[in-house]
Amino acid sequence: MDGHERWLERCSKLGTTFPARRYNEGTRTSEDAALQLGCDVAHIAKSIVFEGPESPVIVITSGANRVDRKRKLKRLLGFKPSMAQAEYVQQQTGYAPGGVPPFGHLLPCTMVMDEDLFQYESVWGAAGCAETVFSVTPSELQRITGALVGDVKQ
């Protein structure tokens, strides 16, 4: 089972479905996804995985932003998460970097969402692999993930 099939299965368990688009050219980076979709990179909801003291921390942020983990994320969470290595990302989420979706992870994760995403009617997130994306409203994304919303950008 590939990452996209795994994500579809987990969506089903959550009682939700999202049509996904597949691009053979890849959507591994926010820039790649925006190019394939023909949208601004800010409309990409990238999922960045960090190591927390007890569980992974996933920050869903605008593709145009970088996460300020040393100051803003630390203020929101009460600790500064560490950068995660690819092996950790795969083991904790069930997905490879570049395809980590904002929900449907293997293990429970602490979720944080960039407040900047709420300025858009819809955003695009990875759908389990580096070739698939799906569209969702920011409010629906926050509802599904239960993410803490805040200012996380540098």
Q: What function would you assign to each model-found segment?
A:
Residues M1-Q154:
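Extended, low-hydrophobicity, polar/charged segments
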